[in-house]
């Protein structure tokens, strides 16, 4: 048997314009979005099929990628392609309102749901880590998480600093696909930020895409810049090459006091995503292949040091929170018993939004024309006229966010609003106002599509943190409702054994049939989030369910 190819020296970019390369827009859309995930402007390591988040891939290997492209190119509108951990395994006759693609990535029976077992399967070519939007083909670059991070910083500013972050600064680490959103989000929220990153290539990526403003030469230079900009009231983001497990303890030792502390290193994956203190990146990658157990141990020991420093900041009264990378869990496993003393960002700042089905609604212009996104921005403002916060976000996004690959936009909207926007976008395609169809999707990090006790479902008030029926129901309902492609993943964000989550994407191609599917999917999808939180007893969700007329049999 020929060994599967994990590396290919090639550049992939999605087709642009309104000329089809597949049989219809329902199959052209997943084809373009798969390719867009691997665009060198989008992906972290596209030649190895890695999109973001350590080893989050778009396809299992290059042979699988080629066959997915082949299958989508010839897929009919009454057929469905099944993808198992990045490998196309079957094409079946279904019907025109069924999904064109159904994806299951990284799922393991719970007893075996560990990194150790997954890595064995991955080495044998039997599995693929799909992260959240890598293996579900709806990653749009760091913009995909910018607004969620922005909303978090804004809410933290409201709670701790009277809604004013001017002259304040955020300390964090990690400038990968997810963490790369932090510096821009902090700037948009009005704060300075110091962003520690151990790879110069990641810093360069964020500098080139304008997600980070400057790079300091060393820690002293970084602190001098922070002092200058905070005194001047300027919101400037600063990158610093270094290891967080070394720099945070040094900051504690020096008595430096940030105004907010968080982290977005790839701590969820100690073998591939977190550089042990004192190691070079080349050493880390080489030893990961020859002595993985020792590498994992060293990475987790460094995480323990990192978390102890974060706890020290919290003890000083500095707002400190986990941003969903499972670093607290890793530190606790290394003996830091009080690792969970600082909260996760969802229970601390975001859950009230989830209770109303508000979450990361995103869309991409398959035309490749930025004007299509600017026109949809205007439509969002027209249809949601009274939300000044949303309008401000859209204005800032247009000014500051560079498109990566196919032009795309994200904004957090909820139940009722998503369907209204989707139907309007479909009408814009029908009328020719948009030059080609758009796709609408979301992160798996949403109100009803994830079970993750150390992140999205941390500290649920009824204790249902680990109940994972909800993302399964979300995926089933999106399939029944007619989403264009639906995905069900395990381990995204926080790593193997710690999460299950689902995603959906729907195509707006301007047809009546699309409008019917959009109305169902973009209502039902956020409605499951309201349902899930109402079931857990959150009054905000119960009130929203009643206002929106949801039929929840056990909610009176």
Curated annotation (Swiss-Prot):
Identification of the protein by name: Urocanate hydratase
Swiss-Prot/TrEMBL catalytic activity: 4-imidazolone-5-propanoate = trans-urocanate + H2O
InterPro entries the UniProt entry points to: Urocanase, Urocanase-like, Urocanase_C, Urocanase_central_sf, Urocanase_CS, Urocanase_N, Urocanase_Rossmann-like, Urocanase_sf
Subcellular location: Cytoplasm
Pathway: Amino-acid degradation; L-histidine degradation into L-glutamate; N-formimidoyl-L-glutamate from L-histidine: step 2/3
Residue sites binding NAD(+) per the record: 53-54, 131, 177-179, 197, 243-244, 264-268, 274-275, 323, 493
Active site: residue positions: 411
Keyword line: Cytoplasm, Histidine metabolism, Lyase, NAD
GO cellular component: cytoplasm
Listed Pfam families: Urocanase, Urocanase_C, Urocanase_N
Enzyme category, top tier: lyase
Purpose: Catalyzes the conversion of urocanate to 4-imidazolone-5-propionate.
EC number(s) stated in the UniProt entry for this protein: 4.2.1.49
This protein's record includes keyword Lyase: yes
One GO MF term: urocanate hydratase activity
GO biological process terms, semicolon-separated: L-histidine catabolic process to glutamate and formamide; L-histidine catabolic process to glutamate and formate
Cofactor note: Binds 1 NAD(+) per subunit.
